[in-house]
């Protein structure tokens, strides 16, 4: 994959430039655009992934299915499809916004900061996974309610963005509705 950049955002969440992805994620990460996607299979199970140990931020933690950064002149939906193919080797359908105005700032144990405007989507996986081990070290299909119980019991085992997204009652209800259709 070619070098990725993040789209930097100003105080009004408007694009203000780009920065190479790894250079952007530091102790003083600037506000930038991202996305988060929760994938469900045909049985309504959620794909939970464990981030590779080579990841700069939150290596080895469990998280929602796929996250990433739209590139300049790329829609969020196009970026989600691209990252699903790259990280999970999977095709998706029924891409649906579930928490369009999510944003957060969090610092990992190594001091790396995430500072993102990060719309959240749900989608349906339509092919068999072919996981990229440089991105994902483990994965599991689980019932959404079981994942929610785990998030409540052991939030430290999951990415902070996943915990925050699922903690929003409206987003959680939308995800639950999505997995049941």
UniProtKB/Swiss-Prot annotation:
Domain of life: Bacteria
Gene Ontology CC annotation, any one: cytoplasm
Chain residues that bind Mg(2+): 87
Required co-factors: Mg(2+); Mn(2+)
Stored PROSITE patterns: NUDIX (PS51462)
Reactions catalysed, as given in the entry: isopentenyl diphosphate = dimethylallyl diphosphate
Active-site positions on this chain: 67, 116
GO annotation terms (biological process): dimethylallyl diphosphate biosynthetic process; isoprenoid biosynthetic process
Protein name: Isopentenyl-diphosphate Delta-isomerase
Gene: idi
């Amino acid at each position: 994959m070619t070098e990725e950049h993040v789209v930097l955002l100003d105080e009004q969440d408007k694009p203000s430039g780009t920065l190479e992805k790894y250079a952007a994620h530091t102790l003083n990460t600037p506000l930038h655009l991202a996305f988060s996607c929760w994938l469900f299979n045909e049985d309504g199970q959620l794909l939970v992934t464990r981030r590779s140990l080579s990841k700069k931020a939150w290596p080895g933690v469990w998280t929602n299915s796929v996250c990433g950064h739209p590139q300049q002149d790329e829609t969020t939906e196009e970026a989600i499809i691209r990252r699903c193919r790259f990280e999970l080797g999977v095709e998706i359908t029924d891409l649906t916004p579930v928490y369009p105005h999510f944003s957060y700032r969090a610092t990992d144990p190594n001091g790396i900061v995430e500072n993102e405007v990060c719309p959240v989507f749900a989608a349906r996986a339509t092919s068999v996974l072919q996981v990229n081990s440089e991105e994902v070290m483990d994965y599991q299909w689980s019932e959404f309610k079981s994942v929610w119980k785990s998030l409540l019991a052991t939030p430290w085992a999951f990415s902070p963005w996943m915990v925050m997204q699922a903690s929003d009652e409206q987003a959680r209800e939308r995800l639950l509705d999505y997995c049941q259709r």
